[in-house]
């Protein structure tokens, strides 16, 4: 099973939870909460991932990153963005220098 397959399956499950009962589904509860609540949860999970990295704790890095990705998928679902949209963007960037890509974003359009 590929990573993209797992992400797609998880995204479908999250999408299906949009209409689930928030009193029995954590995912439905987050999907039906305010955007700020979801964003705070992402910030919390990002901080926990950072702390696991600082501690050089491989197992915790994996665990916390999984939490972070899960909550990011919830955020993406709320904005009707699929994992495939993100994977396409990563594919588009493949082989492009990060410095070069950033410079292209800051250059004004010369045709104007």
Curated annotation (Swiss-Prot):
Catalytic activity: 1-(5-phospho-beta-D-ribosyl)-ATP + H2O = 1-(5-phospho-beta-D-ribosyl)-5'-AMP + diphosphate + H(+)
GO BP term (any one): L-histidine biosynthetic process
Pathway stated in the Swiss-Prot or TrEMBL entry: Amino-acid biosynthesis; L-histidine biosynthesis; L-histidine from 5-phospho-alpha-D-ribose 1-diphosphate: step 2/9
Keyword line: Amino-acid biosynthesis, ATP-binding, Cytoplasm, Histidine biosynthesis, Hydrolase, Nucleotide-binding
UniProt EC number: 3.6.1.31
Gene3D superfamilies registered for this protein in UniProt: MazG-like
GO molecular function, one term: ATP binding
Keyword Hydrolase assigned: yes
EC top class, as a word: hydrolase
Subcellular localization, as worded in the UniProt entry: Cytoplasm
Source organism: Nitrosomonas europaea (strain ATCC 19718 / CIP 103999 / KCTC 2705 / NBRC 14298)
CDD domains according to UniProt: NTP-PPase_HisIE_like (cd11534)
Family as reported in the entry's similarity comment: Belongs to the PRA-PH family.
PANTHER family (alphabetical): HISTIDINE BIOSYNTHESIS BIFUNCTIONAL PROTEIN, HISTIDINE BIOSYNTHESIS BIFUNCTIONAL PROTEIN HISIE
Name of this protein: Phosphoribosyl-ATP pyrophosphatase
GO CC terms of this entry: cytoplasm
């Amino acid at each position: 099973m590929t990573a993209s397959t797992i992400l797609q399956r998880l995204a479908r499950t999250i999408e299906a939870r949009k209409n689930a009962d928030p009193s029995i589904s954590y995912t439905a509860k987050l999907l039906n909460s305010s955007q700020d609540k979801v964003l705070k949860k992402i910030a919390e999970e990002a901080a926990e991932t950072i702390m696991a990295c600082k501690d050089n704790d491989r197992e915790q890095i994996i665990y916390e990153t999984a939490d972070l990705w899960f909550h990011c998928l919830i955020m993406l679902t709320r904005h009707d963005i699929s994992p495939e949209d993100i994977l396409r963007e990563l594919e588009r960037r493949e082989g492009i220098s990060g410095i070069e890509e950033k410079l292209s974003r800051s250059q004004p359009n010369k045709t104007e």
